[in-house]
Curated annotation (Swiss-Prot):
Pfam families: YidD. This is Putative membrane protein insertion efficiency factor. Disulfide bonds: none annotated. The keyword Membrane applies. It is found in: Cell inner membrane. It comes from Shewanella woodyi (strain ATCC 51908 / MS32). SMART domains: Haemolytic (SM01234). It comes from the Bacteria. PANTHER family: MEMBRANE PROTEIN INSERTION EFFICIENCY FACTOR-RELATED (PTHR33383:SF1). InterPro entries: Membr_insert_effic_factor_YidD. Could be involved in insertion of integral membrane proteins into the membrane.
Amino acid sequence: MAKTQSPLQWLATTLIRGYQVFISPFLGANKCRFHPTCSTYAIEAIRLHGSVKGCWLAARRILKCHPLHPGGIDPVPPKTHRCNK
């Protein structure tokens, strides 16, 4: 069964998909130095962690995407469950 998205998650992922479809193709070849790309990472992070934490993770990832960073494979961190002991 598919997990339902909150309206904020839907909005964020729709805006990112719009970027992927309408803006990214005009920027030339794949310029992201990471795998998965920053936009794909953002969608995965928002779907897994929710809109607030997912956007925070995506922003941190985008800030690392510059010529001085080596890039490479950088998957979305798994969701951890906090429990009080």
